[in-house]
């Protein structure tokens, strides 16, 4: 075994050779200043979900999976992330493998559709090649693939109906993610895969649900969010939206398994004011006495809906409440396994 001085010199030489061959940052000592920078993130449009994710939103330079049943709000959540990225001056891309993107709805959620890059690929291979090229450019801040289930391999499209193509899609996803993860990390781009749920046949015990596209995405994703519609929201006899629960089932950048609930309103998306109101009541920033909601010495409304509308009409009060909710969370991001 080398003595300490010789070992240090040998290590310095080895590290300089590695950096010369593979570039600066290829190897680093974690004790050094700025060895691991703070994890940058993009807000989700829901303050409670940003707090649950631990880093203030979805982390940049990582793979994210949003999965859930049909009409649960998967695309809505992804479009909100795009909207927030654009507000920060970022460029967003949407790979619409399902050929079902509603531009009008995206616009209502605050997406600047004129600046949005949209691709409607014919095959799964084409979709993932486009995604790789965009991420490799280094200019994209967030890229959404909607959805993994619609990434149909070329062989399946060109084959006859009824042909067996066992494991083709899983192999395609595995190969693509092996190539993508490295360049996603270097480019600081947030790549969101939207996924659907399927039922495993013959499962007697445990959860019969699984996601499409094999297991590769489960492993490569730094954050996995399970989104579910838990109740319908009504105003009189009219349906105005749905109460939605999101569970962070995997999180490599903060403690996982946190759950949040918020409203998704039809034609409006995530109810930011409703979300802030619920969180403020939970944290005693807003007081609830019977049906009345009070902030400071001022009553803001009778009933949750009236209070939500008050916050919508008074953005300066909403911003003030939001600031009080965010400030104690600044040191709450506890990085887990990175």
From Swiss-Prot:
Subcellular location: Cytoplasm
SUPFAM superfamilies: P-loop containing nucleoside triphosphate hydrolases (SSF52540), RecA protein, C-terminal domain (SSF54752)
Keywords for this protein: ATP-binding, Cytoplasm, DNA damage, DNA recombination, DNA repair, DNA-binding, Nucleotide-binding, SOS response
SMART domains, per database record: AAA
Residues holding ATP: 68-75
GO cellular component: cytosol
CDD domains: RecA
GO molecular-function term, one example from the UniProt record: ATP binding
Signal peptide annotation: none
Top-rank taxon: Bacteria
One example of a Gene Ontology biological process annotation: DNA recombination
Main location: cytoplasm
Keyword DNA repair: yes
UniProt family annotation: Belongs to the RecA family.
Protein task: Can catalyze the hydrolysis of ATP in the presence of single-stranded DNA, the ATP-dependent uptake of single-stranded DNA by duplex DNA, and the ATP-dependent hybridization of homologous single-stranded DNAs. It interacts with LexA causing its activation and leading to its autocatalytic cleavage.
Protein name: Protein RecA
